[in-house]
Amino acid sequence: MAHGEPYYSSKPDKDFNFGSTMARRQMTPTMVTKLPKFVRNSPQVYDWIVRGLIFPTTGKTYFQRVVVITGGFEDGTYGSFAFDGREWVEIYPIEHLNLMSSLKLIHKANALQERLRLSQEEKATLTLDVQFLQHENVRLKELISKPEPRKIQMKWIIVGAVLTFLSLIPGGYAQSQTNNTIFTDVIAACKYSTETLTENLDLRIKLALANITISDKLDAVRQILNFAFVPRSHWLRTVFYYIHYYEMWNIFMFVLAIGTVMRSTRPGTDLITLATSHLSGFRMAVLPTIPFHTTMTLWVMNTLMVCYYFDNLLAITMAILAPILGIIFLCFMEDSNYVSQIRGLIATAVLIAGGHACLTLTGTTTSLFVVILTCRFVRMATIFIGTRFEIRDANGKVVATVPTRIKNAAFDFFQRLKQSGVRVGVNEFVVIKPGALCVIDTPEGKGTGFFSGNDIVTAAHVVGNNTFVNVCYEGLMYEAKVRYMPEKDIAFITCPGDLHPTARLKLSKNPDYSCVTVMAYVNEDLVVSTAAAMVHGNTLSYAVRTQDGMSGAPVCDKYGRVLAVHQTNTGYTGGAVIIDPADFHPVKAPSQVELLKEEIERLKAQLNSAAENPSTVITQQPTATLEQKSVNDSDVVDLVRTAMEREMKILRDEINGILAPFLQKKKGKTKHGRGRVRRNLRKGVKLLTEEEYRELLEKGLDRETFLDLIDRIIGERSGYPDYDDEDYYDEDDDGWGMVGDDVEFDYTEVINFDQAKPTPAPRTTKPKPCPEPEAETQPLDLSQKKDKQLEHEQQVVKPTKPQKNDPQPYSQTYGKAPIWESYDFDWDEDDAKFILPAPPRLTKADEIVLGSKIVKLRTIIETAIKTQNYSALPEAVFELDKAAYEAGLEGFLQRVKSKNKAPKNYKGPQKTKGPKTIIH
């Protein structure tokens, strides 16, 4: 195809026709076969470039031309390829702006087509799912049985109609309507007005004469009950007339019959009960007794009411005998059913006998109806024990809940205002970390623990005497070892290596005990409570109810920092023991030398006491006896007394806290500032430069000689004590503060107030070395060398003028000796990085005296940073600073503090005041 037709990979490529046509003509079938995988249906740019511009070429082939093709890929990038005769080689891409614009449009079109394809597939899938759901819906509808319409039998409709007809018959109080004319109405109105006027005049006369009798009061009450105050032309009169005409029972039975036919599940039984109640004359008195009946006793009652309609004496006799016969013949039933049947028969007997008595005496059963309702209300009121009672159906299901608390139907906002109160503040949020809690499981019981550092902290009484405990965290069980238990009720458990908690709790740097938060796991549920706390020595008290499993829970502040460990609950208040950073590390056992010193002191005290008291005192050694543990009344009384003592102490502390603002304390003045001698103000000033120190080391001076030279330099440079400014006045300074623990006086020193420069200590001049004959080499004998030094010192020419004695040898120490409490805190990565300076910043003295210890500490720091375990770091730094103190150098922790780079977890600065000279 050389010099043939131009090659085009696709129609878009032909349409755009980018690049050189000659290059397209150079395309061969081999080149076409090995073309890179460009975007389908996309244009390419063909270039015909000199070979030497692409490949390193020499000779005649430099000016040969090669085909270079540039195109886009599926991932949105593009590249250029040159054909070297065998294959296409990728070269640095050549920029063609037209090609890049075209490729962007093509990629965008391809992306839209892909999105369209995916949308169409998703639409087809959703359409198919909808069709499946429609078919499933139709199938499920066919399986559901359709409820048939309620059908009421005709016989019950007829019975309801009969009862309705009976209820519409006028009652016994109905009167026949007479023919009235306008004249009779006028006469009746005048008569009523005259009677009313007469009654009013009589009432006013009695009121004026104060002649009101009891009968008058009863008449007034009767008129109120009869609504005599309602005018005759009012619509209420018409309502009362029809109620009086048809009677209340007839209207109620009419409504109840219609409701029974429409809604009742047993319309036959209900309608027959209404009919027998109406025929017997008991009427409303029957309804309150219905809940006491069963199905059998209900039909017994209906039978007796029908019998009462025909023969009342026979019905009363059968009703009285019914409970007795039921007790005898129904004894085969179970207890619950037996009691229900007897209760229904007794209710039937009471209804028949009481109804007959009421009908005989008053002609109505209203009084019996009121008595039965009163008994039911009294029975219900006697069982209102809780805050509410539940009404259940026959199956035991709660159908209603009625509160027993009396509540106002109106004006209840007064009660709500009194109960809720007016908000006067806003409660703050507290930080909790449930991921830092775990459950401690021991054979004696369970408790709560929390993660802090590399330990699990809990209460000591939760661990007990166990060496190993089980730690439950997020449903998994781990076995852990008890590391340390201090004197407090706290235990520290080593966190297992395969246990990785999601959160850890830190100790509070600035404890705030005003408001505490207790969180723990109780029955696998997280419980949180917030309360105000008070401090009582090393314990806290707060009003929180303790449940089983809360011992060892963390007591935190509002920021989630640990303040104490929950331990006990006696009565109303809960208690916790305050936790300090010093509790995390065990107290080091005294060394053998210290033990021997204590033993010597104890023996000396015994000797002194024996010398003072010659009489021999025989002390009986306590014998270990094993007694069976028992609890008697005295032990219980002691426990109660202990609990009451703690509660009273807490109560006193709370009262004192409340009364603290009212107690005033007189302030006195103690002057400690004016005229006070300020000694050791030049502490920390370098007495030797690096050059001087290096020269002394090169001369090979030993330690004693080196310290003697430093003593002479101090004698030359030190001046008189510095005084405060005379203008400064401290109102709390009365001159007695000159003598204190921080001021050391030399009572043999004579202060010259003429401020003459003191004479430095005399210097001893060394004699010039004289040549001596060479001696044979002898073994090194330190004793002989020491004797020679003494003889050499005796040969020194002493001045004839009397001078002060030479200063005694001394050793220089920088500040106070390091104490372990200053190093015992939570170290982290920042503390480890800043504790040692960079190697170029170390002094020569540090490298010579502390070189090996510094290298060891650097190794410990690197290991701690890699493993994130800083437990060994405090002890290593303490040993290094202790060695520096013994060598007269400044401690590294003090150096960090002096540069304002104290560790962020640093417990407190050491109260150092610079170099201090100690005379041995």
From Swiss-Prot:
Active site: 461, 489, 551
UniProt biased composition (Basic and acidic residues): 783-795
Gene Ontology CC annotations of this record: host cell membrane; membrane
Keywords: Covalent protein-RNA linkage, Host membrane, Hydrolase, Membrane, Phosphoprotein, Protease, Serine protease, Transmembrane, Transmembrane helix, Viral RNA replication
Keyword match Ribonucleoprotein: no
Gene label: ORF1
Catalytic activity: RNA(n) + a ribonucleoside 5'-triphosphate = RNA(n+1) + diphosphate
GO BP field: proteolysis; viral translational frameshifting
O-(5'-phospho-RNA)-tyrosine modification, residue list: 693
Name by which UniProt lists this protein: Non-structural polyprotein 1A
Classification of source organism: Viruses, Riboviria, Orthornavirae, Pisuviricota, Stelpaviricetes
Residues covered by region (Disordered): 752-815, 900-920
